[in-house]
């Protein structure tokens, strides 16, 4: 058994070996570490070594800091658990090196292998640059957050590593004829809630999960308030009287899960969508038609709940007047004298 201090993070690690099994726990003080050790010693009949206090420059593995980030900050994020799972998988792919040995070169080598499909189930279908960039951003954020909390005292090992340039993905949206076909198939579904969920998404620009998990308390005459949003900010969007009258008048959650039913409805409607945009096409459709009908980009930002205008600007080109001066001032229409 041993109690040792990490000289970089200032914490104390108590290591207890009972019948060949190791139990390790970190403490803020030496006293707490020793108490843990003494309690463990009393609970075992195995022979143990005397306590040793060791100075060590070794840091825990990368996954230790990922878990620490989650415990101190990540669990407050709406996607915290999903992000933790991705980060743990990333640590595993990296071989979970000691955190003080992890550096930009190790990550750069990993990115190359990742894009080559080495860690993919199907090596012929490697991830896109966007996927690797998300991993990069997540891990960089771990070190930045821990540094701000004084849990990581050296430089961020990913400082200076640039993200890959990404191709802009197509934002698919539905035309009027597509909407009619889709709604018809949704209304014919065995899931009685599907048509209403889809109508809410199309009428408000809500994300699928926001509409699917609506409760009675979020609906008031001609308005819906979306909570538990991606930005963690509530937003209220007006709806028509017609849509309001269609919604169930009951307490608690209004709808059952309908994702699989929606997927089947899209197939029956023979609508082809880009990969990864199955339900999000409804949100894109709202935003695209909002701008095509002359809506204001700043108002759209508030309706969608975007944190920055840059996110909303993806829809600016749908505005009727967007870059219309190209028609007026091009050399075919108006050659310079």
From Swiss-Prot:
The active site is at 207, 230, 280, 283, 306, 315 (o-(3'-phospho-dna)-tyrosine intermediate). InterPro entries: CB (IPR044068), DNA_brk_join_enz (IPR011010), Integrase-like_cat_sf (IPR013762), Integrase_catalytic (IPR002104), Integrase_recombinase_N (IPR010998), Tyrosine_recombinase_XerCD (IPR050090). Residues 60-147 form the Core-binding (CB) domain. Homodimer. Belongs to the 'phage' integrase family. PANTHER family: FELS-2 PROPHAGE PROTEIN, PHAGE INTEGRASE-RELATED. Integrase is necessary for integration of the phage into the host genome by site-specific recombination. In conjunction with excisionase, integrase is also necessary for excision of the prophage from the host genome. This is Integrase. The gene is int.
């Amino acid at each position: 058994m041993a109690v040792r201090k990490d000289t970089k993070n200032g914490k104390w690690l108590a290591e207890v070996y009972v019948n060949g099994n190791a139990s390790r726990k970190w403490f803020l003080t030496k006293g707490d570490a020793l108490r843990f050790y003494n309690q463990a010693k009393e609970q075992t009949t195995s022979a143990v070594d005397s306590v040793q206090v060791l100075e060590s420059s070794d840091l825990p593995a990368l996954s230790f800091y990922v878990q620490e980030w989650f415990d101190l900050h990540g669990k407050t994020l709406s996607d915290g658990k999903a992000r933790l799972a991705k980060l743990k998988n990333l640590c595993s792919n990296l071989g979970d090196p000691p955190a003080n040995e992890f550096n930009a070169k190790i990550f750069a080598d990993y990115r190359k292998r990742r894009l080559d499909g080495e860690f993919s189930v199907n090596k012929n279908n490697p991830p896109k640059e966007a996927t690797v960039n998300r991993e990069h951003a997540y891990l960089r954020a771990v070190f930045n957050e821990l540094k701000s909390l004084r849990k990581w005292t050296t430089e961020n090992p990913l400082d200076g590593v640039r993200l890959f340039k990404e191709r802009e993905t197509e934002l698919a949206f539905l035309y009027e004829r597509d909407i009619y076909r889709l709604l018809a198939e949704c209304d014919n579904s065995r899931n009685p809630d599907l048509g209403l969920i889809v109508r809410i998404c199309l009428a408000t620009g809500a994300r699928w999960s926001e509409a699917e998990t609506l409760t009675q308390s979020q609906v008031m005459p001609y308005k819906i308030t979306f909570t538990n949003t991606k930005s963690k900010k509530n937003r209220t969007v007006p709806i028509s009287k017609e849509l309001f009258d269609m919604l169930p008048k009951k307490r608690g959650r209004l709808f059952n899960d309908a994702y699989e039913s929606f997927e089947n409805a899209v197939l029956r409607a023979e609508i082809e969508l880009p990969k990864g945009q199955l339900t999000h096409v409804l949100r894109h459709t709202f935003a695209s038609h909002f701008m095509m009908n002359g809506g204001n980009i700043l108002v759209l930002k508030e309706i969608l709940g975007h944190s920055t205008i840059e996110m909303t600007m993806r829809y600016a080109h749908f505005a009727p007047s967007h870059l219309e001066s190209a028609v007026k001032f091009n050399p075919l229409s108006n050659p310079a004298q």
